[in-house]
């Protein structure tokens, strides 16, 4: 490709509304342009990267035995009503009616559509297992699209769905998809972790996320410093303290704390160790409960894990925190003064709280706290559960090493769905015993557009993007200095361009009438891995300057050796 026949569209300045580095660099490198909130046009450079990602995904899915299909973006509402997700999915599901007043949705995912297809196409266990995938546009009406294509409303996704007659068969495909995803992200040159995860609104039993490690990530990824254990922080188990609860050394005392409405204020004003404080959070109880609210207690320096809390049988789903009005109606005190003593509603405490003694907590009286609280002396030990987020340094749940926490960007997710959708949509086949058998399902997603942004978040420097070779828009940039004034430079540039293309190498020849500084800046911004610079001074010695984008190293290579050298660098 020649720049004179290409839409380069690079920008010198960073757009003001671009928050994260991937959004900034995708705009500056001429990869995308914003059409509306959460909607982007992909320009030629962006499309080239996108296609590289797609091709790797497609190759590995095919290698794993999956079969490619294509399903409509527009889906009839009755399928979503049949599955029960019409009400469950919420406002992210874009709903509309056609001219015949028939309701439809823009598909955020395709469990309903594929299950409907399979219930009409398959009849016997002999046709299974099967695994179908597509790479297709999805739409989720995000309330606040942000971070460019990282959290956009329209995006490209690879979604796959497998069908089985046994859990054992599902496990085999699940393991194959786990391995395929690992190959996909390894081929792309990404530093990633596969972590245990919550199944969320998709449902099902087992689940793993594939997280690209990056400081800008929205998720906390937890992993052991010794073993292979890794999990999303939502799912990581916080192990109970090994040490037995210390004996009480203080009497419980009611203390006036009118200006301490938060743990931080309590600690500062009374010089308390934060590890000796407890915070109390009130959430709505499950419908039909004899109490409207449930009290959840975690140590002052810990955070409530909302996913774990929502799974408590007495807690309403989705988890909803009580308003001050609702709290006062039940406890007669405000949010800054709550604690376990004389709490008139059910209480669940974290494992760490259960091991505490001589601790401080609200007295359920405005402006007052109890100091020196001890379980079973001042208040009965309530139900104990794991309801907090782990922190760095906690013991690993597998008993090996301690936990580290890094930020991650979720780029893939695999689920064992079980029979959630097949039961709802009555998808079954005749089993080996001749009886009707509901199908067992798995689903497997990769955010293709998100992978592009995640790769940038992990691969950039002060000059621009530093693409891993496998997904770079071009493999080689040819920069001929003053080619429009030097016939020798122009002739060699054309010769190398032809020879490299003949070797199957993707080349961008910068044949613009631009200053060398502009040419260098653009190629580094775009992130092309290999650059060769042709100039009269070096050609006098039969040399060409070669530069590797990732480490910035330069070397002079003889003109007659450059093609062979590049082929070896790129193809090995």
Curated annotation (Swiss-Prot):
One of its GO terms (cellular component) is cytosol. Transmembrane segments: none annotated. Its EC number is 6.1.1.15. It is found in: Cytoplasm. The keyword Electron transport does not apply. One of its GO terms (molecular function) is ATP binding. It is an enzyme of class 6 (ligase). It catalyses: tRNA(Pro) + L-proline + ATP = L-prolyl-tRNA(Pro) + AMP + diphosphate. InterPro entries: aa-tRNA-synt_IIb (IPR002314), aa-tRNA-synth_II (IPR006195), aa-tRNA-synth_II/BPL/LPL (IPR045864), Anticodon-bd (IPR004154), Anticodon-bd_dom_sf (IPR036621), Pro-tRNA-ligase_IIa (IPR002316), Pro-tRNA-synth_IIa_bac-type (IPR004500), Pro-tRNA-Synthase_IIa_type1 (IPR023717). The keyword Thylakoid does not apply. Its main location: cytoplasm. Keywords: Aminoacyl-tRNA synthetase, ATP-binding, Cytoplasm, Ligase, Nucleotide-binding, Protein biosynthesis. One of its GO terms (biological process) is prolyl-tRNA aminoacylation. Catalyzes the attachment of proline to tRNA(Pro) in a two-step reaction: proline is first activated by ATP to form Pro-AMP and then transferred to the acceptor end of tRNA(Pro). As ProRS can inadvertently accommodate and process non-cognate amino acids such as alanine and cysteine, to avoid such errors it has two additional distinct editing activities against alanine. One activity is designated as 'pretransfer' editing and involves the tRNA(Pro)-independent hydrolysis of activated Ala-AMP. HAMAP family: Pro_tRNA_synth_type1. Homodimer. Belongs to the class-II aminoacyl-tRNA synthetase family. ProS type 1 subfamily. NCBIfam families: PRK09194.1 (NF006625), proS_fam_II (TIGR00409). Consists of three domains: the N-terminal catalytic domain, the editing domain and the C-terminal anticodon-binding domain. This is Proline--tRNA ligase. It comes from Shigella boydii serotype 18 (strain CDC 3083-94 / BS512). The lineage of its organism: Bacteria, Pseudomonadati, Pseudomonadota, Gammaproteobacteria, Enterobacterales. The gene is proS.
């Amino acid at each position: 490709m020649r720049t004179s026949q290409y839409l380069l569209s690079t920008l010198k300045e960073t757009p003001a509304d671009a928050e994260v580095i991937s959004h900034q660099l995708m705009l500056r490198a001429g990869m995308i342009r914003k059409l509306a909130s959460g909607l982007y046009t992909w320009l030629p450079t962006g499309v080239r990267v996108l296609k590289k990602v797609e091709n790797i995904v497609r190759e590995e899915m095919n290698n794993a035995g999956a079969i490619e299909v294509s399903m409509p973006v527009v889906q009839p509402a009755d399928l979503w009503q049949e599955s029960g997700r019409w009400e469950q999915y919420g406002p992210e599901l874009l709903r509309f009616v056609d001219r015949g007043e028939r309701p439809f949705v823009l598909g955020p995912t395709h469990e309903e559509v594929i299950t409907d297809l399979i219930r009409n196409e398959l009849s016997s266990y002999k046709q299974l297992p099967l695994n179908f995938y597509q790479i297709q546009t999805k739409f989720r009406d995000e309330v606040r699209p942000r971070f460019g294509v990282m959290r956009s409303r329209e995006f490209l996704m690879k979604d796959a769905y497998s069908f089985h007659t046994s859990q054992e068969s599902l496990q085999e495909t699940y393991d194959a998809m786990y391995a395929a995803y690992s190959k996909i992200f390894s081929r792309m040159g990404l530093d990633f972790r596969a972590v245990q995860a919550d199944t969320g609104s998709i449902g099902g039993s087992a689940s793993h996320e594939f997280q690209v490690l990056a400081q800008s990530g929205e998720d906390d990824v937890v992993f052991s410093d010794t073993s292979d254990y890794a999990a999303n922080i939502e799912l990581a188990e916080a192990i109970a303290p090994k040490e037995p609860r210390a004996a009480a050394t203080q009497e419980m005392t009611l203390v006036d704390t009118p200006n301490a409405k938060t743990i931080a204020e309590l600690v500062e004003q009374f010089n308390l160790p934060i590890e000796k404080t407890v915070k109390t959070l009130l959430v709505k109880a499950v419908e039909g409960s004899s109490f409207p609210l449930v009290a959840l207690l975690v140590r002052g320096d810990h955070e409530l894990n909302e996913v774990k809390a929502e799974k408590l049988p007495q807690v309403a789903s989705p988890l909803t925190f009580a308003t001050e009005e609702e709290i006062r109606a039940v406890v007669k005190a405000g949010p800054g003064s709550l604690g376990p003593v004389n709490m008139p509603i059910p209480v669940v405490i974290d494992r760490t709280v259960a091991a505490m003694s001589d601790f401080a907590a609200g007295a359920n009286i405005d402006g007052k706290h109890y100091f020196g609280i001890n379980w079973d002396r001042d208040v009965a030990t309530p139900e104990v559960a794991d309801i907090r987020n782990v922190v760095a340094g906690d013991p690993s749940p597998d008993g090996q090493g301690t936990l580290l926490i890094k930020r991650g960007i979720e780029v893939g997710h695999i689920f064992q769905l079980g029979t959630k959708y097949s039961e709802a949509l009555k998808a079954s086949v005749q089993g080996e015993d001749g009886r009707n058998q509901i199908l067992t399902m798995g689903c497997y997603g990769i955010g293709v557009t998100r992978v592009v942004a995640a790769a940038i978040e992990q691969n950039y420097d002060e000059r621009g993007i530093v693409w891993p070779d496998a997904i770079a828009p071009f493999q080689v940039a040819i920069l001929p200095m003053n080619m429009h004034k030097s016939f020798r430079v122009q002739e060699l540039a054309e010769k190398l361009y032809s020879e490299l293309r003949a070797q199957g190498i993707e080349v961008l020849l910068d044949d613009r009438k631009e200053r060398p500084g502009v040419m260098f800046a653009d190629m580094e911004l775009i992130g092309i891995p290999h650059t060769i610079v042709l100039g009269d001074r070096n050609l006098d010695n039969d040399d060409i300057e070669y530069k590797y984008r990732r480490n910035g190293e330069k070397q002079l290579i003889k003109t007659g050796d450059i093609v062979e050298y590049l082929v070896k660098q790129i193809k090995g």
